[in-house]
Amino acid sequence: MTFANNIVRDMAYTLQDIKVESGSKAVTQNVSLKRAVSCFELRATDIMPLTTKTQEITISGNCGTVFNPSTGFCKEKATITRNFSLVAKAHQERSIHSTLYTLLTDKDVTDIHITATAKDKEEKVIKTVNFDNVHLVIGKKTTYTGPIFTYPNNISFTVNQPEIPESGYDKKF
């Protein structure tokens, strides 16, 4: 299964036999759906510069956008790039967050690399942050929270509580 424009959205699925009978007899079947995606959320604790126009987030590693319903995993690895248009003036009193969904090649992966790049209207890079060995789990959300635009050279991480059942691998930098 391929997502439109290769943009993975929150989704659930099932793989089971369904009983089909002829005639007009009604058939009831209970279907239990499983969430097939992993969610990554990047939350800024600082205010973005007024010159910010776009944010590009790239995810790579054991993830992708093509779903194999017979295995419940990503069919093939692919680098995922999402671009977000921003109105910096609207975020001067509150921070921003970006949420991305991805399919994984296994239930629990630890080799995900994420790059977030803020650019101005002339496509010049304002700030880039990189995260290696991001831990994602199918059906869970991992949130990274910290100063995206003004982070210091040394970064520390702490856990943040997500709305979707937490993966246990959230970090604060």
Predicted regions and their residues:
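Beta-strand secondary-structure signal
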Residues: 28-30, 39-43, 56, 113-115, ...
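Intrinsically disordered, low-complexity repeat and linker tracts
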Residues: 149-173
